[in-house]
């Protein structure tokens, strides 16, 4: 017996207040959620039908002011900010481009909430953190950004859980570092905290924008979801790129009077010839923090980058909505590429969904990071 068709609904909302303004019949939709990134949304809206134009879609999708929500069978699965629209008169279609709520914080700078643009010297202000848990730092970066007049888009922390990793960080006002960049840099540190901004319906039935911060990881570990090729795993790609590998990494810090601060991390047990690269963190003045960045960068480039993409069934266990970015998964494959058969652990780092314009067209593509020891 065929199940009930999956229903997608697309809502517009006011970015500042969060109030839903209308529902639009979008099609050719694709949206993605990424760990420690914003994720994207693309869709088209036909304007030739008077039943649609009466909703005044141009006003509903004003870039930088409008938000979008995606609801799947009554559950919010995506939300973000409309940044681009493009109308084409030839086919009377409006193309809409949006990015997750994290993208808003790419347009904000790490400055104290009391910063007065009319009378404050940037060189005299900073946002400091001394021996603070890194998960608290992530939450505070978002809170400080939203404490500025007109800067609150109602993203609230889901919890106050701590990671047990403390850090001392200072964000000078003169750096004008974006809040989004500060969050990503924090996550990229060795044992740095994962983060994602998602949404759910609150007790009053209205969407709630949530900042979830890992301790340090997000997601479900230890009891992985399982995808098997030929069953709930429809297809996969297996790209391996060794062009950027290195066994020795130089991390370059601030240039001071006595020269540039440099940290080096090396792995001599890869079985590969020595290769070298460098990464730049010219704003860093803390030697230990720079060493952490060097080790983190080395871990990312010490072996060929393998980022498989899995095309999975949305309607078979584990069904779409039962897993999220950060979760562990087990992949089972036996085919001409792995003729002996193999299974390996991965971590979900991206989920891209194409709902389809008709029933039965829903597609889900997962980007995963293989665990150590993957074939």
Question: What does each of the following model-derived ranges do?
Answer:
Residues 34, 85-88, 198-200, 354-356:
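Short beta-strand micro-motifs enriched in acidic
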Residues 76-81, 95, 224-226, 343-347, ...:
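Well-ordered beta-strand positions in beta-sheet-rich domains
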Residues 92-96, 207-209, 247, 362-364:
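Short beta-strand micro-motifs in enzyme catalytic cores
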Residues 101-241:
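Charged- and aromatic-enriched interaction segments used to assemble
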Residues 16-20, 49-53, 76-78, 103-107, ...:
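Short, surface-exposed beta-strand/loop "edge" segments at domain boundaries and coil↔beta transitions
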Residues 1-130:
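Beta-strand-rich assembly/attachment modules of structural machines
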Residues 28-59, 229-375:
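An acidic/polar, Gly/Ser/Thr-rich interaction patch typically located in mid-to-C-terminal regions
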